[in-house]
Design a protein with these regions (language model features):
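Structural signal for interior beta-strand "rungs" in well-ordered beta-sheet cores
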Residues: 2-75, 79-82
Length: 83
């Protein structure tokens, strides 16, 4: 199961894995895949067609425009991996 907070929007054909956590105001566009154990923080946006890898963390307010590798952390606009 996944945990979605208040104000989350999940688009058409989105696939959400097990144990995913989404903070308030997260927007997941259509045709997105979120891997198991991912965490997406407040106000983040994941654009259409993106895959968020298993165990990844998306920082608050990030705009994810490309795939996120498993077990990585991305932040910013556009979202980039932390070094």
């Amino acid at each position: 199961s996944a945990q979605l907070n208040i104000g989350c929007v999940v688009g058409h054909d989105a696939r959400i894995g097990d144990y995913v956590t989404m903070a308030q105001g997260v927007n997941i566009a259509g045709n997105v895949t979120i891997g198991n154990d991912a965490t997406i923080f407040t106000g983040a946006i994941v654009l259409p067609g993106v895959t968020v890898g298993e165990g990844s963390i998306i920082g608050a307010g990030a705009v994810v425009v490309e795939d996120v590798a498993p077990h990585s952390t991305v932040v910013g606009v556009p979202a980039k991996p932390l070094a």
